[in-house]
């Protein structure tokens, strides 16, 4: 899980979702998981 100021899709499997007010990226590749902080 990376905490970033700006979350971006890294590959085509990445999806940007908003979970309880927090922007997240979920992906099949665990390295691509991100959270806005």
Curated annotation (Swiss-Prot):
The keyword rRNA-binding does not apply. Keywords: Ribonucleoprotein, Ribosomal protein. The gene is rpmJ. InterPro entries: Ribosomal_bL36 (IPR000473), Ribosomal_bL36_sp (IPR035977). GO terms for biological process: translation. NCBIfam families: rpmJ_bact (TIGR01022). Coiled coil: none annotated. This is Large ribosomal subunit protein bL36. It comes from the Bacteria. GO terms for molecular function: structural constituent of ribosome. It comes from Shewanella amazonensis (strain ATCC BAA-1098 / SB2B).
């Amino acid at each position: 899980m990376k905490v970033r100021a700006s979350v971006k899709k890294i590959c085509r499997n990445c999806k940007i979702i908003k979970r309880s007010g927090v922007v997240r990226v979920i992906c099949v590749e665990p390295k691509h998981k991100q959270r806005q902080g």
